[in-house]
UniProtKB/Swiss-Prot annotation:
It comes from Homo sapiens. The keyword Zinc does not apply. Coiled coil: none annotated. The chain crosses the membrane at residues 355-375. It is a single-pass type I membrane protein. Keywords: Disulfide bond, Glycoprotein, Hydrolase, Immunoglobulin domain, Membrane, NAD, Receptor, Repeat, Signal, Transmembrane, Transmembrane helix. It catalyses: NAD(+) + H2O = ADP-D-ribose + nicotinamide + H(+). This is X-linked interleukin-1 receptor accessory protein-like 2. Belongs to the interleukin-1 receptor family. Gene3D superfamilies: Immunoglobulins, Toll/interleukin-1 receptor homology (TIR) domain.
Amino acid sequence: MKPPFLLALVVCSVVSTNLKMVSKRNSVDGCIDWSVDLKTYMALAGEPVRVKCALFYSYIRTNYSTAQSTGLRLMWYKNKGDLEEPIIFSEVRMSKEEDSIWFHSAEAQDSGFYTCVLRNSTYCMKVSMSLTVAENESGLCYNSRIRYLEKSEVTKRKEISCPDMDDFKKSDQEPDVVWYKECKPKMWRSIIIQKGNALLIQEVQEEDGGNYTCELKYEGKLVRRTTELKVTALLTDKPPKPLFPMENQPSVIDVQLGKPLNIPCKAFFGFSGESGPMIYWMKGEKFIEELAGHIREGEIRLLKEHLGEKEVELALIFDSVVEADLANYTCHVENRNGRKHASVLLRKKDLIYKIELAGGLGAIFLLLVLLVVIYKCYNIELMLFYRQHFGADETNDDNKEYDAYLSYTKVDQDTLDCDNPEEEQFALEVLPDVLEKHYGYKLFIPERDLIPSGTYMEDLTRYVEQSRRLIIVLTPDYILRRGWSIFELESRLHNMLVSGEIKVILIECTELKGKVNCQEVESLKRSIKLLSLIKWKGSKSSKLNSKFWKHLVYEMPIKKKEMLPRCHVLDSAEQGLFGELQPIPSIAMTSTSATLVSSQADLPEFHPSDSMQIRHCCRGYKHEIPATTLPVPSLGNHHTYCNLPLTLLNGQLPLNNTLKDTQEFHRNSSLLPLSSKELSFTSDIW
């Protein structure tokens, strides 16, 4: 009988020892330790704060006075690592008052844990409190780390109290509290009422969320406490809703074996308090964790959130799909109100689908490439076709007379060697001929159409303003003589180019590098706002279906094609150097019924055998001609000209000719035939 009794005694001893160890698990050196209290104290630097010993408010049923009367002493320590150091109160910045520590002006270094110990020779109990002191954030009246948090459902009633106000009350009066929202005074709505030290919102709206700061004065210092109010939707009474896959509508996904796969499950969760969304995948009755290692769940992703309502996603990930993975997978979503689920069926993809997809995408890609190539090669032709059939006439109601103003250089063949006669003929003959005769445009050519009515500059400015385009034929001679100077000297013309009031078409007749100062050309291009550059390539551009003429017509105004009568442009005997293109003379033509007494033999400078038979004339001006100078005899079909060189319109005198008396020059040559030298004895820029 003794062995069983001894065994029972040993067991009782062990149990008793274990019970004693459990009862002393939270005690150190015989002192009961309640660890850290849930309440945290927070203050801004420079503000007063009171840290109260939590033993008298949450752990023992007695107050400080009663405990002191029974011989218990209250001592304070500050935790520094694993050590607790006694606090020496300076009475200046920090003092002890009954069951509390008063920080009269808290500093950031005061942050930490403070332990109050209540003990005598036979009894000991302690607890720690947390204090956080922080500086204001830049531009704010609070620090986001030391805000209090309150929540309220939308449309509900909410009261926001000013924390720790009891610590700053005086026995005879309530503290005067001022409320701010986002650190600014606010005109509260009628349903928001300040009730004592609290702010009462009778019906919370979404816009009521934010930071509320209460402010009061204590011992000459400001005390601020900030509370963040989070507004949420009404507490839901419904289970979550699957968004993909859809509930009661299984989705079928065709997969290719050996390829990775990612299947998302999306669901909507109404606001259900502090509980987070619960979402997971299953294969039949097994959780994903129970399946093979190549199948796993991803992380829960928050897609959207509004007032606590969330849309989340959980992906089912296959590193490489195998035959055994072709099955039904279910996504489950839960909250405290219930559970919903939706399914996905994996099915093997036939190879024909891939071939069809590749063929379709390839055909679309080839079609896009073909369209791009066609556009790159025929973009101008396409635009001209569109303009011809659908474009509006640009010349309607714009109050402009001419389609383009032609600016070029006429070179004196006797005084300047011309390296490019083909370019000269193009600028003076071919270009106007084709634009007027073939395409029906109306050009203003100064040498032909200028009718003096004022000063030369005013006349040119007026005609440029009446033109829809400005065509500049850019030859080396044009650049050497700075043919564009007229557009820089006249302010109105310069403003038209700079502001884009008129579009400029710049035609380059040759490669300019190495022949002229290209910096001036580039400066000219930069000064023009609306500029199109077209290059004339000689014989390559001679045919009407060449890229040059199509590009030029594209840059010209949109208008219906109007063919001008040939008699207005060319003589029947005139032929050009370009075969298909017919030239017009460098000086516009006209004829007169008046004839001179002198015969052809009397005109030593008249050369009927020239390679190009060009009828020369100049515009008639208001010049009184005596009737006696027109005799009856006729010279036949010869043309007559006023001997008034067009260069004199600028007030210039012919080069290499010195006139002693300009008036005598005009008086003695009022009506004489002009020789070819007189017609080209200088370089005129128009």
